């Protein structure tokens, strides 16, 4: 009986050591992958896998499900495409920044020297602020600020090289969507860019599955903005469409735009 128990304990101990070894190998691999990204020139492109490696190292605190969403966001959203469009060493306002994943990745990739993220969710901002503390040791010269603020209460003062509005408008009531869009545009400095992405409203089955996603995670019935409407709002505001892309990840459809503010307003 004693020999049997001893053998059982030894098997459990060996299994625990193997699991610990795999965890250490996985962690070291993630650290090395992220360090490779940090060491690259800012002009170098990143992959979706790079986004996952960065997220796993930066977002290590908070609820397990929240960490899971951050670690795997790159599987359903073209974050690397957004990063590729942002110039090196810019300052950015991220409206509806959530947990700060985009700002974190831009910072590690050398695309951001100063970032201000705002979101109406205090829990999301708490996660972003925790990430900012970790980023401070990785990229010490970056200035990051995350603030809990409702869009209806107004945006931070000042102008920025880049203003990002990513997956926000479909959460805004239809009667306030155009105002929120144009208000964010007012924070783009002359010659700067307005980086916009939202979920597609067609085909119907992609739009429907996107809607089910938000019903499950945000408990919200979302309201799509046709990309044609966003293009019209931007051009009426004096911006030009510099980049127009459509992307799919799994069943998720994404419409991406870069709207450029002229150096000299008409």
Predicted features by range, described:
Residues 172-183:
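A short, conserved alpha-helix within the catalytic core of class I
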Residues 72-89:
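Conserved alpha-helix/loop element of class I SAM-dependent methyltransferases that forms part
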Residues 121-123:
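Conserved SAM/SAH-binding beta-strand->alpha-helix loop
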Residues 56-76:
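Class I SAM-dependent methyltransferase Rossmann-like catalytic core
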Residues 99-111:
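Conserved SAM-binding loop of SAM-dependent methyltransferases across substrates and taxa
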Residues 164:
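A conserved beta-strand element that flanks and buttresses the S-adenosyl-L-methionine
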